[in-house]
C-alpha cells in the first residue's frame, strides 16, 4: 500500500469483505456497517473501509446522523472527502425517496401497523429515541421523524420540537413512539405524564395524538390500548 492510499476492502480476508458476503449470502445478510463500507470502498491509512463505516455508525445517532448530515459535516469525519460525501448523500437521498414513496401508501389502522414500521429498527437502539409518525386525514403515513435521543422527559419532548415536523407536513394527527433499550416496553410514569402533556398540546394545535407506542425487544405497548392517553 502506498502512503497516500487508504486501506481497501480487497485487503481484508475474503470472509470479511462485504461485497463478497453480499454476493454469497444476499444483501439482507449484511450489517449496516457492511453496506456502508461497500459505498465507501476505501478507508484511511490506518482503517479499512469497514472500520470507517463502523466508526461513523458508532455515535449515539448512528444512521440518523448520516441521514441528516450536511456535506460539510460528512467531510469533517476522518476518511470522508468531498467525493465520498457526495456519493453518500446521493445514496441516502435515493433511500429517502423510496421510503417516502412506500410510506405514502401505508395506512395505519391499529397499533400493530405502527409497530410494523418501527419495531425492527428501534428494538436494537442502545439509547432512547423519540419519534413522531405523521398522518393525514385518511390515516396515511406522511413521514416518520426523529425528535430526540436520550431518556424521555418533558425537556426532551417539548411540544415545540415534537410538533415541528408534523406541522411542516400538514399532519392531521400523529402517533408518538419511543424505545426502551432495556427491552421492556412497560410505560413509566414519566412516559405517561409526557404523553398526556403532548395530547393537550395537540388539542391546542389541532393535531390529534392518536397513540404512543413504547418499543421493546420484539414487543411493544400501546398507551391507547391501555387507556393511558
Swiss-Prot record:
It comes from the Bacteria. PROSITE patterns: MPN, UPF0758. InterPro entries: MPN, RadC_JAB, RuvA_2-like, UPF0758, UPF0758_CS, UPF0758_N. Keywords: Hydrolase, Metal-binding, Metalloprotease, Protease, Zinc. SUPFAM superfamilies: JAB1/MPN domain, RuvA domain 2-like. This is UPF0758 protein Moth_0536. Residues 107-229 form the MPN domain. GO terms for molecular function: metal ion binding; metallopeptidase activity. Pfam families: RadC, UPF0758_N. Belongs to the UPF0758 family. Zn(2+) binds at residues 178, 180, 191.
